[in-house]
């Protein structure tokens, strides 16, 4: 697995964990938990690739990985829509800024996972 991809993903998670949204912090903590889950999933795929040493062998051996990856993309799309919705309904400008930052980070996470998935295809 590309070490730059791993460190970039970890940086995104670190920045997300440092965000404080006041009354919305519970929502953010739930999102961070889901980000951690996505990171663990992505890392487990990377470890499987390293153990196998052959992407084609991994693909033929594990026919469910595409379905799992699709589910993770659905999860992150849902998170993006949830943040967009919260951004629209929030009237506090400080929280709006934080949700805009969260949205930007979510889009970065989606890009990281997409990049990694293309490595598996």
Curated annotation (Swiss-Prot):
The keyword rRNA processing does not apply. SUPFAM superfamilies: Nonstructural protein ns2, Nep, M1-binding domain. It is found in: Virion; Host nucleus. It comes from the Viruses. Its main location: virion. GO terms for cellular component: host cell nucleus; virion component. GO terms for biological process: exit of virus from host cell nucleus through nuclear pore. A motif (Nuclear export signal) lies at residues 12-21, 85-94. Keywords: Host nucleus, Host-virus interaction, Transport, Virion. Pfam families: Flu_NS2. InterPro entries: Flu_NS2. Signal peptide: none annotated. Belongs to the influenza viruses NEP family. Interacts with protein M1. May interact with host nucleoporin RAB/HRB and exportin XPO1/CRM1. Mediates the nuclear export of encapsidated genomic RNAs (ribonucleoproteins, RNPs). Acts as an adapter between viral RNPs complexes and the nuclear export machinery of the cell. Possesses no intrinsic RNA-binding activity, but includes a C-terminal M1-binding domain. This domain is believed to allow recognition of RNPs bound to the protein M1. Average number present in a viral particle is estimated to be 130-200 molecules. This is Nuclear export protein. It comes from Influenza A virus (strain A/Seal/Massachusetts/133/1982 H4N5).
């Amino acid at each position: 697995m590309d070490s730059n991809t791993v460190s970039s993903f970890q940086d995104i998670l670190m920045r997300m964990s440092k965000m404080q949204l006041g009354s919305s912090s519970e929502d953010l903590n739930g999102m961070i938990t889901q980000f951690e889950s996505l990171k663990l999933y992505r890392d487990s795929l990377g470890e499987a690739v390293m153990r196998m040493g052959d992407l084609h062998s991994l693909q033929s051996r594990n026919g469910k990985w595409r379905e799992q990856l699709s589910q993770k993309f659905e999860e992150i799309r849902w998170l993006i829509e949830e943040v967009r919705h919260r951004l629209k309904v929030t009237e506090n400008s400080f929280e709006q800024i934080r949700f805009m930052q969260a949205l930007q980070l979510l889009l970065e996470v989606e890009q990281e996972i997409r990049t990694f998935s293309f490595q598996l295809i």
